[in-house]
Amino acid sequence: MSRRSSRGRGRNKEFKEFLKKNKKMNITIIVLLVIIICSIATYSLIKINQDRKVAIEKDRISMQQSDIFKSANAELESLDDYKSNSLIRISAVGDILCGNNLEKYGMPYDSIFTELKKKLKNTDLTLGTYETDVQDSKSDFATSIKNAGINYVSLAHNHALDYGEEDLNETNEYLNNLGMKTVGKYEESSEKRVKIFEKKGAKIAILAYTYDNGKQGVNIYDEEMVRADLEYANQNSNFSIVMMHWGDVYSSEISEEQKSQAEFLIDNGADIIIGAHPSVVQKMEVVKNKDGQDCYIGYSLGDFTSDFENEDSNLELILNLQVYVDTEGKATLYKVDYTPVYMVDYGKELTDNRFKILDMKAEIANYGEGQNSVTEDIYNKLVRAVDKLNSIIIKQ
């Protein structure tokens, strides 16, 4: 046997032994490759489904905003020749609360409203119900509310006299000194109870009432007083906004009392009704008054600021209204929509910057584009909030 043949057989033997030794390794590599390929495919599928989910949520919010007020906004076509200086832009938020956690861990308070300042300040009038006081650090909270763009607040609520009439008077004076107008503190005459806001040649009357809880100091809803106030408003303004503190807490259902009071207000000249107190969102609608003009009712916009551990209470609406003023000074409801927002609590482990109000539509869009401005947990809360809005606004 030649030396070359012997060497060849030796190499074949070594090669077979190499294959045998590495057989398990090869199988492992193949398995790993299969896992990697499957993972990539699964991730791609999840990403596609996630993108579809985000798109659906964006579309659903847009659908809510466009479907609700078709009857009111249909009149836009007849006003195509309007000029921007003939429109008064009004925004409204719900109850402005400053609970213990928000007071202690929400500082600096300005950071809560970062996403909303431009939206709220780009209006002629921004309304809300100021359901807290200005003691201790709450005075800084009041300043941040003003900085956020809110310039007109109702003091007619069930907690107005929790700390006595002196505290109510101090709150009223402090807010006025900040540059925020107030309404709802009890006065003897309609002339003093009804506040008039003037803009672009129009006068807008602002009225505010709360339900009777056995305390005085603010305007308690009473048909005789309300009728007199609206009569004064109709004689001295072009348009009337009534802020109501009513309804059942934590209920998205409209009570019979709310329906009855809303009908009474519209029949006596109210053009817009803005509701608060339930701490959750309730439905909204556009109805015709006796003259066939559109009137808006927002039964509850929810809590603008709160620290309740309740997802439904963290959901809130910013109402956006446009009032058209013609050359003769007549004012009519021109357009209505809303911005859904959500109050986020970033966790009990934080001692500051714990709370923030998010623009739901913007955050859902950002999440879909890969901008990690919110966590998956917060995103899922926003999705659940969209579901809640859908059940309240579309299906009722």
Q: Where are the regions a protein language model picked out?
A:
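N-terminal Lys/Arg-rich, disordered targeting/topogenic segments
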Residues: 1-26
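Acidic, metal/ion-coordinating pockets
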Residues: 26-396
